[in-house]
Amino acid sequence: MDQEQILEKVLEVVRADTHGAASLTLFALMKTMSTDNGQYLFLLNKLRDISPDMRELAYGLMELMAQGRNQAESWNRTLADIESAIRNG
């Protein structure tokens, strides 16, 4: 999947179940990786709580961060949409 597909799929997962384990885990991972000067502290054992398909999305998000794409406008826009969905969900 490319960047847009990964971000769109994550947003789709969150909108489908705003307070589900996968939604909140993916949101926490994205939020953690959004601070460029942060240390990206995330409890990887949380990945055990989600399905293999959702872990694939998490790995995709990690790859985007490794490529420096976690500072892109599309990342920030998706994160804002996710925050809004969770807040209003």
Task: Please state what every model-predicted region is.
Residues M1-L29:
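Short terminal alpha-helical segments
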Residues V10-V14, S34, M62:
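Amphipathic alpha-helical interface segments used for dimerization/assembly
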Residues A16, T32-T35, Q67:
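Positions within ordered alpha-helical repeat solenoids
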Residues T25-D36, G60:
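Short, hydrophobic/amphipathic alpha-helical patches that form generic packing surfaces
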